[in-house]
Amino acid sequence: MLYPLLTKTRNTYDLGGIWNFKLGEHNPNELLPSDEVMVIPTSFNDLMVSKEKRDYIGDFWYEKVIEVPKVSEDEEMVLRFGSVTHQAKIYVDGVLVGEHKGGFTPFEVLVPECKYNNEKIKVSICANNVLDYTTLPVGNYSEIIQEDGSIKKKVRENFDFFNYAGVHRPLKLMIRPKNHIFDITITSRLSDDLQSADLHFLVETNQKVDEVRISVFDEDNKLVGETKDSRLFLSDVHLWEVLNAYLYTARVEIFVDNQLQDVYEENFGLREIEVTNGQFLLNRKPIYFKGFGKHEDTFINGRGLNEAANLMDLNLLKDMGANSFRTSHYPYSEEMMRLADRMGVLVIDEVPAVGLFQNFNASLDLSPKDNGTWNLMQTKAAHEQAIQELVKRDKNHPSVVMWVVANEPASHEAGAHDYFEPLVKLYKDLDPQKRPVTLVNILMATPDRDQVMDLVDVVCLNRYYGWYVDHGDLTNAEVGIRKELLEWQDKFPDKPIIITEYGADTLPGLHSTWNIPYTEEFQCDFYEMSHRVFDGIPNLVGEQVWNFADFETNLMILRVQGNHKGLFSRNRQPKQVVKEFKKRWMTIPHYHNKKNSVK
């Protein structure tokens, strides 16, 4: 899906700002009362003073009367949503015009043509934040009958982050040609000497056109190639490299009877990805991933788009010598992906497939029992849709170097292989760049119990030795994690290993002479132990800390106003360990052939 840009043939109007708002039922044929308002884009939760409203589950409404811009007879009007979490129904003047399920990918709805001559239209958005065993993420949904006979809806999350909800990303009103560019796919093949590239363009239009013209510009806006065919050869190319991004721009124009119908510009980078011999190669050089699992999570905004925080986070990431992040545990905003492209940051791109086990307590149970997860889950349709929409959205981003099919599912239980095999294949069939696919493995899915890692290209592990296992005992933890990593390497000698989560909750300012858990001293010792092990595993090609910053969670005995595993506090202030990471990561090259340095 194309990002909403202003071009010669397209107008975009930002509908963000203050909207009328209501939790609960509403008839869209009536006006929504204006006694309560809400911001778009943002999460509604943390703007609520009332705890009951903050934790509300069910339908909630946004409504606004907007001016109708001029629309010519050969144009159409579209409402384009960056995301609505988790379900949405869109009404224009009380009439349902579109709906979408899935809270982290964009969608659009056409405004009926009969409304184009109206002076104003009323846009109503019915959003819903219910999660159950058919949705991604997964939640345990229940209904409680209150004393007054009313029904209270409740979701017990199968995941360890707060169920923020709302119109989280930009809402645009677009005026575009009826005959328009629907999608653009760009692929490339680099020459043996990496000095030139063959480009292929697939331009999809919603109507037949006579001609497609493609012009490619470099970063100085100099024309470097043009074609009326689907192919183009570029010489003396600049590669997209780690923290040294180079973006070309493809201007696509479509014509009928020599008349311009639509124009759109898509950025792209030239780079090559390969997984081979236990290494992850970018432009034929081995990469070492240094970075983080993150969350879209800030004060007041919740999960709503915060572009200032995005930029601050990537500035802090680069300052530490890091080069990557994972979009844990859902697709991040299009704005963040475009920023990563521009800054040369590697992205491991994840669908919202989190909570794929019986319940959250089951995820903490390290015993080998089978909880019957794959007989319980009804998420297949939602999972397929999430993969399709993510690949459609992110396929051209050079920053995206790997797809994630799920985070910490019950991959050790019977039925896991049958569930994931077609989903991994779906990724590979859909992705025009044929990126590697991985699954982020849960702690109890050890090499002898896991049933799915044979399906994926890279072994990604979330491991908490010294925290959830051998809590506070770093001596035993070091023995345990080294033993398991060597077992994974022996089982899959040709697959690289990335630690996608490791960490320890740490309260800023809490100290101890004896380095006990939750102190800043223990966090430093925890990571020192972990890195000592990582450095001795030849196939281990990356370390992504859990987490970049502290973040909000649902209520549980393990959480004191959120998860505190961040290297930074929630307001992005560094903990003591940040300087230790900076020392380490500044000495590890981004391109690092580890097999040459590990004996």
From Swiss-Prot:
Positions of short motif N-K motif: 563-565
Catalysis performed (reactions): a beta-D-glucuronoside + H2O = D-glucuronate + an alcohol
Residues engaged in binding D-glucuronate: 160, 407, 462, 468, 501, 546, 565
Enzyme Commission number(s): 3.2.1.31
Activity regulation info: Inhibited by a set of synthetic compounds like thio-urea derivatives and analogs. Inhibitors of gut microbial beta-glucuronidases are expected to block the reactivation of glucuronidated cancer drugs, and to alleviate drug-induced GI toxicity.
Stored InterPro entries: Beta-gal/glucu_dom_sf (IPR036156), Galactose-bd-like_sf (IPR008979), Glyco_hydro_2 (IPR006101), Glyco_hydro_2_AS (IPR023232), Glyco_hydro_2_cat (IPR006103), Glyco_hydro_2_CS (IPR023230), Glyco_hydro_2_Ig-like (IPR006102), Glyco_hydro_2_N (IPR006104)
Keywords associated with the record: Glycosidase, Hydrolase
A Gene Ontology biological process term: glucuronoside catabolic process
Class of this enzyme: hydrolase
One Pfam family from the record: Glyco_hydro_2
GO molecular function: beta-galactosidase activity; beta-glucuronidase activity; carbohydrate binding
Active-site residues, record numbering mapped to chain: 408, 501
Listed PROSITE patterns: GLYCOSYL_HYDROL_F2_1, GLYCOSYL_HYDROL_F2_2
Written domain comment of the UniProt record: The N-K motif seems to be a discriminant that could be employed as a fingerprint to identify beta-glucuronidases from the large GH2 family of proteins.
Function: Displays beta-glucuronidase activity with the artificial substrate p-nitrophenyl-beta-D-glucuronide (PNPG). Is likely capable of scavenging glucuronate from a range of chemically distinct xenobiotic and endobiotic glucuronides present in the gastrointestinal (GI) tract, to be able to utilize these diverse sources of carbon. As part of the GI microbiome, this enzyme would be able to reactivate glucuronide drug conjugates, such reactivated compounds can significantly damage the GI tract.
Similarity comment: Belongs to the glycosyl hydrolase 2 family.
PANTHER family membership: BETA-GLUCURONIDASE
Name under which the protein is recorded: Beta-glucuronidase
Upper taxonomic lineage: Bacteria, Bacillati, Bacillota, Bacilli, Lactobacillales
